[in-house]
């Protein structure tokens, strides 16, 4: 029975994403029955990843990117250091919030409990409807609901699920500044063989480059000359020395795609360190797939065997 850490307490978007991963049979070693999985709530995303490293959990469901604020930096920073971890699945969740109050609340809202990531996604709504309210930081969206239930805030930015579990009333539902807000969650575990190639896959690595002119361009060239579609590049400080960075790269394709495998080998030769973060299915194609090397392989095989090769136009 897999143990899966997630940002708790119950009622967070992360829990909702985890439940959908379970029902979609996306958990290695699990099935679509949520009773076959043991949820392990944690106080933060880094704590969930550390639970996997320590063996207290088999996997962690964590947010990695949202369409409003971009990458979830605590997740990236935690993946870049410590014992290596690997991504096995992803799920994108539509996000909107509920402004929750206690059932007996009838008055002004002076304080609003909010997870900082959530507050950033409803900034305009708050400025319009609760301009005088003071934000009170919470550890998660569900923790914001708990703060309201405990009387530590007049209202909270939370989820409908958390409101139901804490017996709160919704002052406003479906609140979000951008109607197409989405958050991408990933399932992270200790290193293991990746899920099978599906043809709609994503591969992610974190690179440490030598401090030499053109090092980043040289690394990117290894992808471009193989026609690999790079979908994300982002840098984060190493926190060890000023001016040194870790570069996170996402590309379309799987470790079992020849072009991706060759690019990773080339990066391994060029970079000070290549941390493989996984190859996993995305469900839908998110860019141009890497080119097949079948024809080139057949051509090379004929050369090695001393057989005639057709002219370029006769393939």
UniProtKB/Swiss-Prot annotation:
Residues 204-281 form the ACT domain. InterPro entries: ACT-like_dom_sf, ACT_dom, Chor_mutase/pphenate_deHydtase, Preph_deHydtase, Preph_deHydtase_CS. GO terms for molecular function: prephenate dehydratase activity; protein homodimerization activity. Residues 3-190 form the Prephenate dehydratase domain. GO terms for cellular component: cytoplasm. It is an enzyme of class 4 (lyase). Keywords: Amino-acid biosynthesis, Aromatic amino acid biosynthesis, Lyase, Phenylalanine biosynthesis. It holds the Pfam family PDT. The keyword Phosphoprotein does not apply. It comes from the Bacteria. Its EC number is 4.2.1.51. It catalyses: prephenate + H(+) = 3-phenylpyruvate + CO2 + H2O. Pathway: Amino-acid biosynthesis; L-phenylalanine biosynthesis; phenylpyruvate from prephenate: step 1/1. PROSITE patterns: ACT (PS51671), PREPHENATE_DEHYDR_1 (PS00857), PREPHENATE_DEHYDR_2 (PS00858), PREPHENATE_DEHYDR_3 (PS51171). The record marks 183 as: Essential for activity. GO terms for biological process: L-phenylalanine biosynthetic process. PANTHER family: PREPHENATE DEHYDRATASE P PROTEIN, PREPHENATE DEHYDRATASE-RELATED. Homodimer. This is Prephenate dehydratase. It comes from Mycobacterium sp. (strain KMS). The gene is pheA.
């Amino acid at each position: 029975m897999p143990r899966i850490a997630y940002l708790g307490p119950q009622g967070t978007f992360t829990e909702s994403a985890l439940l959908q991963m379970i029902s979609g049979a996306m958990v290695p070693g699990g099935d679509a029955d949520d009773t076959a999985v043991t949820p392990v709530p944690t106080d933060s995303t880094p704590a969930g990843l550390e639970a996997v490293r320590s063996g207290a959990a088999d996997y962690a469901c964590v947010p990695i990117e949202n369409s409003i604020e971009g990458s979830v930096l605590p997740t990236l920073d935690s993946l870049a250091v410590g014992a290596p971890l690997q991504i096995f699945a992803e799920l994108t969740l539509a996000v909107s919030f509920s402004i929750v109050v206690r059932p007996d609340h009838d008055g002004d809202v002076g304080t609003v409990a909010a997870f900082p990531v959530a507050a950033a996604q409803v900034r305009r709504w708050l400025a319009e409807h609760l301009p005088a309210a003071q934000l009170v930081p919470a550890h998660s969206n569900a923790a914001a609901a708990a703060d309201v239930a405990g009387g530590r805030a007049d209202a909270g930015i939370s989820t409908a699920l958390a409101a139901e579990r804490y017996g709160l009333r919704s002052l406003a539902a479906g609140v979000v500044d951008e109607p197409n807000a989405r958050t991408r969650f990933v399932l992270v575990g200790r290193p293991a063989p990746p899920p099978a190639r599906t043809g709609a896959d994503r591969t992610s690595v974190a690179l440490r480059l030598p401090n030499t002119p053109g090092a980043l361009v040289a690394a990117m060239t290894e992808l471009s000359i193989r026609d690999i579609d790079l979908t994300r590049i982002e840098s984060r400080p190493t926190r060890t020395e000023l001016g040194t960075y870790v570069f996170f790269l996402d590309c379309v394709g799987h470790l079992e795609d020849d072009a991706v495998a060759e690019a990773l080998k080339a990066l391994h030769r060029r970079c000070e360190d290549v941390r493989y973060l996984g190859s996993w299915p995305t469900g839908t194609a998110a860019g141009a797939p890497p080119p097949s090397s079948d024809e080139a392989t057949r051509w090379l095989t004929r050369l090695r065997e001393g057989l005639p090769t057709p002219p370029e136009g006769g393939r």
